[in-house]
């Protein structure tokens, strides 16, 4: 139930900032809802959405880091995690599984499990003839 939030999650020094011409790698959108927490009148869950960081090579696949806040229902939680490796969905596309726990707020935390959205699901390099 450890949460991976920390101040050093992203390596901002290596991001393209006009002086650094490093080629960027792909990202994924994500959205989901946490599992319910607490009981009776306090029982609730939260929604979240965001965009992952760039691909990070891991073995013969890759992963992505992500960080976002949930919506506010008297309080909010943070989600900071690393995806699992790429899962092929055909046609050269893939998704990633993410499973973990939010930060603890208001005396509780929420479990989440979701898959990222397909990277560039509608983009085809021939779609934009200039």
Question: What are these regions, as identified by a protein language model?
Answer:
Residues 1-130:
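Peripheral, non-catalytic segments of secretory and membrane proteins
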């Amino acid at each position: 139930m450890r949460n991976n939030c920390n101040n050093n999650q992203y390596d901002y020094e290596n991001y393209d900032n006009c002086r650094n011409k490093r080629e960027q790698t792909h990202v994924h959108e994500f959205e989901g809802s946490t599992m319910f927490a607490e009981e009776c009148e306090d029982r609730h869950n939260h929604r979240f959405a965001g965009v992952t960081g760039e691909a990070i090579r891991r073995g013969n696949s890759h992963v992505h880091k992500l960080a976002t806040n949930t919506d506010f229902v008297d309080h909010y939680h943070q989600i900071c995690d690393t995806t699992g490796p790429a899962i092929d969905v055909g046609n050269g596309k893939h998704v990633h599984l993410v499973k973990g726990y939010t930060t603890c707020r208001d005396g509780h935390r929420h479990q989440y499990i979701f898959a990222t959205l397909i990277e560039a699901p509608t983009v085809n390099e021939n779609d934009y003839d200039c």
